[in-house]
């Protein structure tokens, strides 16, 4: 759907709105072998074939939660990236799809819905093989991060602007 295209696809392949930006995401153009268009969603991809650093190829499959868990079933995969909190049915499918390959499931989200079952399981009941990275406001700050030898991405002026929008 549009959200998958505008967030995950854009991060990995480059802005879907600008043909010249294709290959400017986390995956460089030189590694993108081919893509398949997603029917019904302008500028969206359903699959991308990527030249892996190992010499083999990896296929990326872009799915959205609104497709339902049935569309997530069957295929064994190495990695699943869940952007925004999934329902338990999708999360369970993601874990199941990676089991036989000893793969990984990444989730990146702000717990907008509060202490859901998924959020609680990571905050209160972290299991062996799981990890939780808690990104804080200070982690985003250029000033505070630079004092720790890290790279934040928000200037003080931008942070003040964001905070004032919530006041």
Model-based region annotation:
Residues 1-167:
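Phosphate/NTP-binding elements of NTP-utilizing enzymes
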């Amino acid at each position: 759907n549009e959200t998958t295209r505008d967030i995950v696809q854009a991060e990995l392949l480059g802005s879907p709105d600008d043909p010249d930006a294709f290959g400017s995401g986390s995956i460089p153009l030189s590694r993108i072998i081919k893509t398949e268009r997603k029917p019904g969603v302008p500028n969206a991809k359903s699959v991308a074939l990527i030249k892996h650093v190992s010499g083999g190829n990896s296929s990326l499959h872009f799915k959205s939660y609104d497709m339902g868990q049935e569309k997530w079933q069957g295929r064994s995969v190495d990695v699943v990236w869940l952007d925004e909190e999934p329902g338990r049915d999708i999360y369970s499918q993601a874990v199941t799809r990676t089991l036989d390959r000893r793969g990984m499931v990444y989730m990146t989200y702000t717990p907008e819905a509060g202490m859901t079952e998924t959020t609680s399981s990571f905050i209160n009941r972290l299991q062996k093989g799981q990890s939780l990275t808690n990104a804080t406001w200070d982690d985003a700050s250029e000033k505070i991060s630079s004092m720790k030898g890290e790279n934040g991405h928000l200037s003080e002026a931008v942070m003040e602007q964001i905070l004032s929008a919530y006041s």
